[in-house]
From Swiss-Prot:
Transmembrane segments: none annotated. It is found in: Cytoplasm. One of its GO terms (molecular function) is structural constituent of ribosome. It comes from Candida albicans (strain SC5314 / ATCC MYA-2876). Pfam families: Ribosomal_L36e. Keywords: Cytoplasm, Ribonucleoprotein, Ribosomal protein. This is Large ribosomal subunit protein eL36. PANTHER family: 60S RIBOSOMAL PROTEIN L36 (PTHR10114). Component of the ribosome, a large ribonucleoprotein complex responsible for the synthesis of proteins in the cell. The small ribosomal subunit (SSU) binds messenger RNAs (mRNAs) and translates the encoded message by selecting cognate aminoacyl-transfer RNA (tRNA) molecules. The large subunit (LSU) contains the ribosomal catalytic site termed the peptidyl transferase center (PTC), which catalyzes the formation of peptide bonds, thereby polymerizing the amino acids delivered by tRNAs into a polypeptide chain. The gene is RPL36.
């Protein structure tokens, strides 16, 4: 609450200007920095896809999404990560079709 400058009441106390506090560093947890994103993109460009990613692409093209999701979950551990990876691989397929 803002101070009123009056000695009594709910907002009692001397009027002061609020100090501008920088946000905590911990609030950025999980967010990728520009540098990290850049380095990862370079590594992916140079190294290519992992063997399981190539297999995922093959499964998406032939057997459909369900098999691909099952394999991705087995390799990555969680359902959420698997869904994200399968979506990423479908984007890779779409990119390869465009070029």
């Amino acid at each position: 609450m803002a101070k009123s400058g009056i000695a009594a009441g709910v907002n009692k106390g001397r009027k002061t200007t609020a100090k501008e506090v920088a946000p905590k560093i911990s609030y950025r947890k999980g967010a990728s920095s520009q540098r990290t994103v850049f380095v990862r993109s370079i590594v992916k460009e140079v190294a290519g896809l992992a063997p399981y990613e190539r297999r995922l692409i093959e499964l998406i093209r032939n057997a459909g999404e369900k098999r691909a999701k099952k394999l991705a979950k087995k390799r990555l551990g969680t359902h959420k990560r698997a869904l994200r990876k399968v979506e990423e691989m479908t984007q890779v397929i779409a990119e390869s079709r465009r070029h």
